[in-house]
Design a protein with these regions (language model features):
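Asp-box/WD-like beta-propeller blade repeats and closely related beta-sheet repeat scaffolds
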Residues: 53-124
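A short beta-strand motif characteristic of beta-propeller blades
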Residues: 8-14, 53-59, 102-111, 157-163, ...
Length: 306
């Protein structure tokens, strides 16, 4: 409820295997989900009461799908696979069901038959380019690529590639509303990077790198998610195992970041977070099975539990 912030469960689909990430179609009448431990993607109709009705499930062949999104025309569903190291473009039918795979784009590994493990598929604000972060994980290369999208065929063409340091492992990125400033977090390196993006050429230019944990932290930590607040003034990053959130103010003229603080997430292993339509920040803690609501102060950049 947006009135009192309370959550009410209305349905539980108990037969679904590890529905690890979901997205709406552009009408928000359909939902698509990847099944993280398998090679499956499912479609659902969203009914008037908010419950889901399963439409179909397809096997794309790529193992461990981790992210899913829909193109601007609502014609294709894009899926990133971690162990498969491949982006899959799937035809979206008018009834919301998933059709055939019409295009693929694979990140090669260090040896023949090996891949770089893709962890995200992020559109620019106009949905003309896709940014896909990949972790090296021994057999591949840690990287982020900019890919030009063919709206008719669903195919991708690389326009630029950023290679990270060995073991830093790029995980997720987020695009600023101005479509020029791109921010990416590196999982093992515990860093957040700032890039300038040129939508005319599809090129990325790395300009800044900051830590996502305080310098006093000596233990293990994994950066997991990066988001921009609704005002477009701040970048936020969640850190697993140190169980914290890092906040950075964005310079409105240059896009450079300045840290405003590190905040406890009040749970264990914050794997994902997002902002609601009410401006609240919701942090999902994987190992404590909790979602914690925070108020985000746009004046100070502070996260305050509600």
């Amino acid at each position: 409820s947006e009135v009192d912030g309370r959550w009410t469960e209305i349905q539980c689909l108990k037969t679904e295997e590890n529905p690890s990430f979901q997205c709406f179609d552009n009408t928000k009448e359909y939902l698509y989900s990847v099944h993280g431990d398998f090679t499956l993607v499912s479609s659902y109709k969203i009914l008037e009461d908010g419950t889901l009705e399963h439409i179909n499930t397809i096997d794309i062949g790529g193992k461990n799908p981790v992210d899913v999104t829909v193109d601007a025309e609502n014609q294709h569903v894009i899926v990133a696979t971690l162990q498969g190291g491949t982006l899959y473009t799937i035809k979206r039918n008018e009834d919301g069901s998933l059709g055939d795979v019409v295009a693929t784009f694979t990140y090669e590994g260090k040896e023949e038959g090996k891949v770089s493990t893709i962890h995200q598929c992020l559109w620019d604000q106009k949905k003309n380019y896709l940014f896909a972060c990949a972790q090296g994980r021994v057999n591949g290369f840690g990287q982020m690529r900019a890919l030009k999208y063919n709206h008719e065929t669903g195919e991708f063409t690389e326009t630029d590639k950023f290679l990270s340091r060995t073991w830093d492992e790029p995980r997720h990125a987020v695009m600023h509303p101005n479509n020029r400033w791109l921010y990416m977090c590196e999982e093992k390196g515990n860093k957040v990077l700032y890039f300038q993006f040129d939508e005319e050429t599809g090129k990325m230019k790395a300009l800044q790198e900051l830590t996502t944990v305080p310098e006093t932290v000596t233990g293990y930590s994994d950066a997991s998610e990066v988001m921009i607040d609704p005002s477009g003034q701040y970048v936020l990053v969640s850190n697993r195992y140190t169980d914290s959130m890092a906040v950075y103010r964005i310079d409105p003229f240059t896009g450079y970041m300045k840290n405003t603080g590190f905040f406890p997430c009040l749970g264990k292993t914050p794997r994902f977070f997002c902002f609601g339509s009410n401006g609240k920040c919701y942090v999902a803690n994987e190992d404590s099975d909790t979602i914690i609501e925070f108020t985000f102060d746009e004046n100070t950049g502070w996260l305050v539990p509600t």
